[in-house]
Amino acid sequence: SSLARATSRSFAVTLDYGLVPPSASVPAAPRFLARLIQKLPPFIGKSGFATGLDHARLRLSPTRVRVRSFLSGSDAARTSFRVPVADSGDVHLVPARSNPKAWRNTLSIDMLPLVGVQLRADVASQRDLRDYGDSTPIARVARLARRSLLGLAVGFEVQRTFGTFFGLTPQVASWLRPRGTLSSGFSLTRDPNGRAPLRAAGDSAGAFRLPTAFSNSQRLDLGTQVDLSRLGRGLFGDASVVTRALARVTTIDLGLTRDRTSTFSGVAVPPGFGYQLAWIGVDGFRSQRGVFATSAAENSTRHASAAASLPLGIRVSSTYQWTRGLTWLLRADGQLPISSWSREWPSATVTWTVSPSRGTVGRVLTSLTA
């Protein structure tokens, strides 16, 4: 058992604002360009791409904007006593206090500039409003990192996240359905309770900074679906033997996926804006400002799949997949690369479906699949 007295108070204030601006758009392409494409052979001039380009408009205003601000804090105190009755030594007891205060702001923007194009950005920042005093070196650094806005103390940033998304599903042709997405995510954390501050430029020069850790990720996904039946009708007509043969191939899907990630810890200086947006090459994931990442990785996958319906109720589906992975781990003398790869091929499935005649066993057995 323990003898203690505890008190606590807390507050929270939230401001949430959402806006759906009216549409403001301009023609996506000059009129002469749309007319020029329509005069090309029917395979292109009468495609969905040509029709869409003639009517497409570029929307300049976002479809949705949301801003959220959240202010929270608490004040708690706890005093522990030695005996269950009042004692003269109680006047020397110092309560243990905790008064965290934080201010978090988020911003989300959605845009649909064109049909089949989607953009999204999410930004969040959290600030620590506490005054850590000057009793320790890292507390003094935390105090010096504090900022003010319009004469009000707004503390220092302890967390930041940044996410982006770009999606593309263009209407190229009725037989071709390409797709593509590019997304990124960034996270940064500063630790005001670390053991010691870090120098921005080596061990003996540069300003002191709070220990910082950050990471990012990038994912690229490209692919397309091909409808050979529609392609055959557009090239050879509906009654062609080639069209009927191509119609048996029901699905063709091609795709490429690439993931890149990296993590940094114990860093004094935050990364550049390009790293936060993941607009960098693989070398930028491995190192920033001369500092190697604690870990970094790049994984890519290529896949293809197809399915065909053959006579006599036979259906064949096949898949090809190739995966390569490369990971870099931090060591004392640099980074150690670890590579791996795998291939899934051949991989196929054959199914046979028979529907017996209603005049025989079909009365009790409607279909048989093997």
Describe the role of every protein-language-model region.
Residues 1-369:
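Exposed, low-structure sequence patches enriched in small/polar residues
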